[in-house]
């Protein structure tokens, strides 16, 4: 039997703790925040499950993973279909035939592919060396300027030319009229929120949980007292920033409660212009179909 310390009660930490406990190991989970579930933490407010740290849509291509999470919660059939708002113009995401039709009036995939190919020509066959060039190589200049450039620069706080190309290596582009953001066959959101999943994972006699507990307050003591430590926090902090600090993208969340039945008609609306001082608005009730 191994005596484990798991630092962080998010999805990874909880899954590890659950599986280790099933195998007879003792697991102590500590969490710096005042709640479990990490960034997938959901909280019910006026009957609505609010994703406290931004939208999380569960999706996977593997049936065994889908079956695994369905042990802990029933999932609805929610399909992620965000939209983009650029100065009041609404576009479908991921970039697909609906987007191309709105932008250029094209109807067939052949017309759309031809339009993008024409716009890629500005690169003169050059291998993309930054995010801007990578985006243009994938979707052309029009979509890049309206739906990628300013949104990305708001997200990262950097000029797109200064960002590496791999950030949008997998920018989804579809030559169909399908608004489903993901290709995975299994997708949904747990009815009643994500927090219950982590609660059930950690409900085991071999698991103890402490919240409001910072690993770094007693790091040396923890490392001495446990056989093995599973650390899910910032890796540069764990090593005392010996190689310097990694750059992390941070987010600020602002919450409003409005007395309206339906504010924006969609769960997620991205604002892709630089003048709007935020990246997106999330209306959480739509994750469970308006309930």
Located regions from the model:
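N-terminal Rossmann-like FAD-binding beta1-loop-alpha1 element of flavoenzymes
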Residues: 2-29
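Glycine-rich FAD pyrophosphate-binding loop
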Residues: 21-46
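Mid-domain catalytic core of redox enzymes
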Residues: 23, 213-291
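Conserved beta-strand segments of alpha/beta enzyme cores
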Residues: 26, 49, 74, 206-210
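Short, flexible helix/strand-to-coil boundary loops that buttress conserved ligand/catalytic motifs
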Residues: 40, 44, 148, 242-243
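Dinucleotide-binding Rossmann-like beta1-alpha1 core, especially the glycine-rich loop
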Residues: 46-122
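A short acidic, glycine-rich active-site loop
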Residues: 52-56, 187-188, 253-255
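Active-site/ligand-binding neighborhood in enzyme catalytic cores
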Residues: 87-92, 97-228, 232, 236-239
């Amino acid at each position: 039997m191994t005596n484990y310390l798991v630092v962080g009660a998010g999805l990874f930490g909880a899954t590890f703790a659950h599986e280790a406990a099933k195998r007879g190991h003792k697991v102590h989970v500590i969490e710096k925040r005042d709640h479990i579930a990490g960034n997938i933490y959901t909280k019910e407010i006026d009957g609505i499950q609010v994703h406290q740290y931004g939208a999380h849509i569960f999706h996977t291509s593997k049936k065994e993973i889908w079956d695994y999470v369905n042990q802990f919660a029933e999932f609805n059939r929610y399909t992620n279909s965000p939209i983009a708002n650029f100065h009041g113009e609404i576009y479908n995401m991921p970039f697909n035939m609906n987007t191309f039709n709105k932008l250029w009036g094209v109807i067939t995939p052949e017309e759309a592919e031809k339009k993008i190919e024409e716009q890629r020509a500005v690169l003169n066959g050059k291998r993309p060396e930054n995010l801007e060039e990578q985006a243009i190589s994938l979707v052309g200049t029009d979509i890049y300027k309206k739906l990628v450039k300013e949104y990305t620069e708001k997200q990262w706080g950097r000029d797109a030319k200064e960002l590496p190309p791999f950030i949008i290596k997998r920018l989804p582009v579809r030559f169909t009229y399908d608004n489903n953001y993901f290709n995975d066959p299994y997708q949904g959101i747990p009815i009643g929120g994500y927090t219950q999943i982590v609660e059930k994972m950690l409900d085991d006699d071999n698991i103890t949980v402490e919240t409001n507990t910072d690993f770094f307050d007693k790091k040396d003591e923890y490392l001495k007292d446990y056989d093995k430590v599973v650390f899910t926090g910032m890796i540069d902090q764990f090593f005392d920033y010996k190689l310097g600090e990694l750059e992390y993208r941070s987010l600020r969340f602002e919450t409003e409660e409005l007395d309206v039945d339906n504010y924006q008609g969609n769960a997620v609306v991205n604002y892709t212009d630089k003048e709007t001082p935020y990246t997106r608005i999330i209306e959480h009730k739509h994750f469970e179909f308006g309930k």
